[in-house]
């Protein structure tokens, strides 16, 4: 994990400059670059970002428990969940840089790639991006899979 994230850190500097010049270009480049780096289909990453945030880089969501307490938060294009922050703190992931589109896409690709590594390159691993692998969240995972597949197949038909 350390090597992958260090690679991400060094790749991000030129991408930061590119995004200042042309945000639309850099977003497309970021999905492609993250896909190559983590061996994940860039169209799948873009489909997830579409479902998660409607491609809004400043998207923010609070996840609440049954009594209305905030238990976690989701940030940016890929809606990176705050539970990852402790694991990524040594790489300076915080509530400011998480909104940078390229950085956010790379983090999302890392999460998805981790799912593929642990549970196989399949739709269940895609569903776990949002709902985890728990038996308790199986229905939510299936619903999420359908949403992502719908976007993904529409993108690939065009």
Per-region residue spans from a language model:
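Detector for methionine-enriched segments
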Residues: 1, 11-12, 78, 155
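Sec-dependent signal peptide recognition
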Residues: 2-6, 10-20
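Catalytic glycan-binding domains that act on GlcNAc-containing polysaccharides
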Residues: 27-158
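N-terminal signal peptide c-region/cleavage motif recognized by signal peptidases
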Residues: 23-25
């Amino acid at each position: 994990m350390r090597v992958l994230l260090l690679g991400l850190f060094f790749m991000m500097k030129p991408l930061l400059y590119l995004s200042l010049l042309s945000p639309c270009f850099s977003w497309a480049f970021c999905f492609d670059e993250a896909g190559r780096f983590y061996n994940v289909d860039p169209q799948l990453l873009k489909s997830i970002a579409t479902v998660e945030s409607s491609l809004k880089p400043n998207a923010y969501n609070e996840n609440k428990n049954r009594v209305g307490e905030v238990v976690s938060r989701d940030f940016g294009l890929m809606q990176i969940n705050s539970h990852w922050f402790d694991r990524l703190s040594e790489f300076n992931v915080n509530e400011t840089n998480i909104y940078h589109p390229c950085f956010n896409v790379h983090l999302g690709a890392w999460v998805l790639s981790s799912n593929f590594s642990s549970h196989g390159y399949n739709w269940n691993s895609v569903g776990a991006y949002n709902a985890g692998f728990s038996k308790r969240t199986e229905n939510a995972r299936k619903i999420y899979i359908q949403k992502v597949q719908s976007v993904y197949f529409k993108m690939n038909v065009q």
